[in-house]
Amino acid sequence: GIKIPTTEFMQELRKACSETGTILILDEIQSGYGRSGKFFAHQYNDIKPDIITVAKGIGNGFPMAGVLISPMFKPVYGQLGTTFGGNHLACSAALAVMDVIEQENLVENAKAVGDYLLEELKKFPQIKEVRGRGLMIGLEFEEPIKELRSRLIYDEHVFTGASGTNVLRLLPPLCLSMEEAKEFLARFKKVL
């Protein structure tokens, strides 16, 4: 749950792919579109993949996905057939999402609010490890988190995700304000 590869690993991976002629495909379905505090999470590592998969954030809840290809691939009209691709409503939603991300500075907000949450969450001794970037945060505990999640949702009305039995996942909307982050921390503290 929310394990961030090191820059060294990612750069060595890029190097190995380049040296062997292997295509580097990065899955940015969850981490892309500002979630990590940069538009794409791999931008923290100063690398360029050959293919990037995107979804989730691209449509802000509307079902949409995409594949971004590097210039090394020559697109050929009619090469890929689909019975569902190019949905006009989905494409309109994706364009609107891009406008809102830019106009409301949501990537910058995800970084600022995420950095604040990461720093504050590290102060809780009950948490074994705090990891993540931007508004993609994993909290690992020594004990299973089932009861903690139940108290958060039923007592404090805070929905969280989970990974395995011991990791609480925080993936709030990119528009989460600093005030809302502080409110989350206050509610989180109550259930620990």
Task: Kindly give the residue locations of the regions a language model identified.
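Conserved N-terminal phosphate-binding loop of PLP-dependent enzymes in the Aspartate aminotransferase
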Residues: 1-192
